């Protein structure tokens, strides 16, 4: 009796078939996994296809819209992480199509002040969008400020009490030894210069000049005066010992490129007419400039400048600060990056009265 003998081949075939099916199933699963993994488009914030091992969520990049170019002159948009080390980058654009998505809108006052109701953004603003009022002009040259009230959340200007402080210039310490050559006094062949564009006969600066020039020769450049071809300003002004850094209007902190660029970059001693001496001394050493308020009359100022012209040691004393400090100047790109930094450092949302603050 051998009833099991004929059944062995049938059992072996079933076992082999089962094994083959299992291996086929494993192979299909493996190749399916490879295909999905290869085709998966996910890229994580760390730049790889795999999540950051720290588990830190990605920080969104603020989108900043420049509603207008300042003075309608486009400028190169910076990488703020390079311009302000330690600052994360922002997406900065002048393309108004992004207005509905923008985290912030910078409005330069000069371009919207003529017709605010038509020139300010008119579409509804998204929740949390912050508007930044921006001006480098004094209140005397900013029209229709009341029309700005109730719209803006942050201020950006030359005023030191702005939410975003953007001065026309500042001093910073040298890192190491001063990199500039000593003053070449022999190249200072002329005495006093003044470059002026807006000539208002009744303005404080023109009235003071008219009294001063009765006692002292002043070379005046600009409209209706001596020609100053573009690109020759520094070369021309560097021949002078003194420069009249007279502001077009008198307001706190309104100390403009007339001092920071025209005078200091030309290595001319600035003779200033603007805010008080104490206001200037918030930004400059007291022996870095001459203030008209230090003299009882323009005649006394003229006499003092003539004395300095003959006394080289006293004249050179106005440059002592340059051994430890150097002047730096404003740029639009830097202003935009300061706004970028502020938006990421502070989430405060408020509505300010521009009129109450600025005037």
Curated annotation (Swiss-Prot):
Cytoplasmic compartment segments: 1-14
Single GO molecular function: 4-galactosyl-N-acetylglucosaminide 3-alpha-L-fucosyltransferase activity
Keyword Secreted carried by entry: yes
Positions annotated as glycosylated: 46, 91, 153, 184
Transmembrane parts of this sequence: 15-34
Biological process according to GO: fucosylation; glycosphingolipid biosynthetic process; N-glycan fucosylation; protein N-linked glycosylation; protein O-linked glycosylation
Subunit (UniProt): Homodimer and monomer. Monomer (secreted form).
Protein name in the entry: 4-galactosyl-N-acetylglucosaminide 3-alpha-L-fucosyltransferase FUT6
Source species of the chain: Gorilla gorilla gorilla
């Amino acid at each position: 009796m051998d009833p099991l003998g004929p059944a062995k081949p049938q059992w072996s075939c079933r076992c082999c078939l089962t094994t083959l099916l299992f291996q086929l199933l494993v192979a299909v699963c493996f190749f399916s996994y490879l295909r999905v993994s290869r085709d998966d488009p996910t890229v994580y914030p760390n730049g790889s296809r795999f999540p950051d091992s720290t588990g830190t969520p990605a920080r969104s990049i603020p989108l900043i819209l420049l509603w207008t170019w300042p003075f309608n002159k486009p400028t190169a948009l910076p990488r703020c992480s390079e311009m302000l080390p330690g600052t994360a980058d922002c997406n900065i654009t002048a393309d108004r199509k992004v207005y509905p998505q923008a985290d912030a809108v910078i409005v330069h006052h000069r371009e919207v002040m003529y017709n605010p109701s038509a020139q300010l953004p008119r579409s509804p603003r998204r929740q949390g969008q912050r508007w930044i009022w921006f001006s480098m002009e004094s209140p005397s040259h900013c029209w229709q400020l009341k029309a700005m009230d109730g719209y803006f959340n942050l201020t950006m200007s030359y005023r030191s009490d702005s939410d975003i402080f953007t001065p026309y210039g500042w001093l910073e310490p040298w890192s190491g030894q001063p990199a500039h050559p000593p003053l070449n006094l022999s190249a200072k062949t002329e005495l006093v210069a003044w470059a002026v564009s807006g000539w208002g006969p009744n303005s404080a600066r023109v009235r003071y000049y008219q009294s001063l020039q009765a006692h002292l020769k002043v070379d005046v450049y600009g409209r209706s005066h001596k020609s100053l071809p573009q690109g020759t300003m520094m070369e021309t002004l560097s021949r002078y010992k003194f420069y009249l850094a007279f502001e077009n209007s008198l307001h706190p902190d309104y100390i403009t490129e007339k001092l920071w660029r025209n005078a200091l970059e030309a290595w001319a001693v600035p003779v200033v007419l603007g805010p008080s001496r104490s206001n200037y001394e918030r930004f400059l050493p007291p022996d870095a400039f001459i203030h008209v308020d230090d003299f009882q009359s323009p005649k006394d100022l003229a006499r003092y400048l003539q004395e300095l012209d003959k006394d080289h040691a006293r004249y050179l004393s106005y440059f002592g600060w340059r051994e430890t400090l150097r002047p730096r100047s404003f740029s639009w790109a830097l202003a935009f990056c300061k706004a970028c930094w502020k938006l990421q450092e502070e989430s405060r949302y408020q509505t300010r009265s521009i009129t109450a603050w600025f005037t």
